[in-house]
Structures are given as C-alpha cells and as structure tokens.
C-alpha cells in the first residue's frame, strides 16, 4: 500500500517514486527508474517506451520503459533520445499502437517522418517506399 501511495504521489507531482510497487490488475512491476509504469509516469532521461500491456494498471494500460540502445523498437509516443533517429515503422508493433525503430545517427542513414535530424546532419534524397510506405529521407553529414 505504501508503494502504491508513493507511486501515485510521484505521478501527480512529476517526481520518481522510490522502490517498486505492483501495477493494479496484472501484477506488472512498476520500477523507480524504468520498468513497467502506469499512464502519466514520466519517462526518465535516456529511456524509451518499448512495450504496451492493454490490461496493465487495472485496465488503464501499462508501459515498459527501458534504456535506449542502437537498434531498439519503441512504441508510438515514446521519446526520441538525443543522438538517435527513427529509421523504420511497424504499424502493428507495440500491441497494435505502432512502433518506431531507433538507431544512432550516422552518415548515410535513412530516416522516417517525424525523426529529428541532429545538428551536423541534413536530409537529402527522398524515397516514398521507405519506412513501411511513409517515406524516408537520406540523412548525411552537413
């Protein structure tokens, strides 16, 4: 009960709860940094959302937060960590809400719509077939 109260207080104040609590309804663990979280929980810097469980958090849905790494699929709505770009899209990924593939930026990488273009890079050639038909731009060093 104490863990649940700390988690709720953290959600409403924008801080991080200490310890872990069980997400009501499905037994998912809610971690102080990353792990399974309920709606409204802040995503820590350097983390992304990688999975969605519709029945988690007593039917409100729960999100799995993990540290970002090169070549990770993330759910639609996940933050994009600085230095990373979006290079592919799967409309059925993340339990049907859509998923984006994150890669570290490098010269000659194809990026999807909504991908940030980091400083020192620019977009050039366009391919309408890229990113599962959403279109993609070749990103090169400026």
Say what each PLM segment does.
Residues 24-142:
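Post-signal peptide N-terminal regions of Sec-secreted extracellular proteins
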Residues 1-23:
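Secretory targeting and sorting signals
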């Amino acid at each position: 009960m104490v863990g649940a109260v700390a988690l709720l207080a953290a959600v409403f104040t924008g801080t991080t709860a200490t310890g872990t609590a069980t997400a009501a309804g499905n037994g998912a663990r809610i971690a102080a940094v990353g792990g399974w979280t309920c709606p409204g929980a802040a995503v820590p810097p350097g983390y992304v959302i990688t999975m969605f469980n519709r029945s988690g958090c007593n039917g409100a849905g729960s999100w799995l937060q993990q540290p970002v790494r090169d070549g990770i699929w993330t759910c639609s709505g996940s933050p994009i960590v600085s230095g990373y770009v979006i290079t592919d899209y799967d409309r059925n990924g993340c339990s049907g809400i859509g998923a984006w593939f994150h890669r570290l930026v490098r010269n000659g990488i194809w990026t999807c719509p909504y991908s940030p273009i980091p400083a020192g890079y620019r977009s050039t050639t366009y391919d309408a077939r890229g990113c599962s038909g959403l279109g993609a731009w070749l990103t090169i060093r400026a």
